[in-house]
C-alpha cells in the first residue's frame, strides 16, 4: 500500500469487545491477541495471503482494557481491544470477521469502527512499536 503525501489519510479505530475463555497473565496477552487476530486471517484466502505476505500490515493494537491490578486478565470477563489501521478494507475485516472469531482463550463479541479526527501529533508514545515475525515464528521466541 503506497500513500501519497497530498492524500488525506484516514485512521480507522476499531473497538472490539472480547470475552476471555481462560485467565491470561499480562506477559502472555500480546501473544494471545496476535493468535486471535491471525486465526481470523485464515478463514479467507485473500486475507490469508495478506497475512502470509512479508510486508508492513498497516495496523496496530494495544493491550486489553481495563488492565487488571494483579496483572491477570480474568476468564469470564469482557475486555476492550482497540485496533487502528489506515486501510478501510482491513478495518471492515476486523469488524466483521473478528467478532465471530475465537481461539482457546479469546472469543470476539462485537466491534465498531470510527474515523479518528485529524489532529497534529506533538508526541507519540507506544508500548508495542513493531512485531516481527520470521520464518521461525514471532521475534520473542525465534530471535531472542
Q: Model-predicted segments: where are they?
A:
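RNA-interacting cores
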Residues: 1-144
Amino acid at each position: 500500500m503506497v500513500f501519497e503525501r497530498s492524500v488525506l489519510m484516514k485512521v480507522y479505530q476499531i473497538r472490539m469487545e472480547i470475552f476471555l475463555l481462560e485467565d491470561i497473565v499480562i506477559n502472555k496477552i500480546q501473544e494471545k491477541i496476535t493468535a486471535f487476530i491471525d486465526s481470523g486471517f485464515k478463514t479467507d484466502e485473500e486475507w490469508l495471503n495478506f497475512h502470509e505476505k512479508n510486508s508492513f500490515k498497516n495496523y496496530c493494537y494495544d493491550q486489553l482494557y481495563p488492565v487488571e491490578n494483579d496483572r491477570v486478565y480474568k476468564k469470564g470477563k469482557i475486555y476492550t481491544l482497540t485496533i487502528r489501521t489506515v486501510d478501510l478494507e482491513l478495518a471492515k475485516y476486523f469488524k466483521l470477521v473478528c467478532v465471530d472469531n475465537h481461539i482457546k482463550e479469546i472469543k470476539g463479541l462485537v466491534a465498531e469502527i470510527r474515523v479518528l479526527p485529524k489532529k497534529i501529533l506533538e508526541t507519540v508514545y507506544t508500548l508495542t512499536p513493531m512485531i516481527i515475525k520470521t520464518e521461525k515464528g514471532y521475534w520473542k521466541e525465534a530471535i531472542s
